[in-house]
């Protein structure tokens, strides 16, 4: 999964 703090849709 995506790392913490990462937003694919900022």
Swiss-Prot record:
Coiled coil: none annotated. The keyword Cell wall biogenesis/degradation does not apply. It comes from the Eukaryota. Belongs to the bradykinin-related peptide family. Has been extracted from the spider web. Negative results: does not target bradykinin receptor B1 (BDKRB1). It is found in: Secreted. It comes from Trichonephila clavipes. Its main location: secreted. The lineage of its organism: Eukaryota, Metazoa, Ecdysozoa, Arthropoda, Chelicerata. GO terms for molecular function: toxin activity. This is Nephilakinin-3. The keyword Heme does not apply. GO terms for cellular component: extracellular region. Signal peptide: none annotated. The modification Arginine amide is found at residue 10. Keywords: Amidation, G-protein coupled receptor impairing toxin, Secreted, Toxin. Causes constriction on isolated rat ileum preparations and relaxation on rat duodenum muscle preparations at amounts higher than bradykinin. Is a partial agonist bradykinin receptor B2 (BDKRB2). Has insecticidal properties. May be related to the predation of insects by the spider webs.
């Amino acid at each position: 999964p995506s790392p913490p703090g990462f937003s694919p849709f900022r």
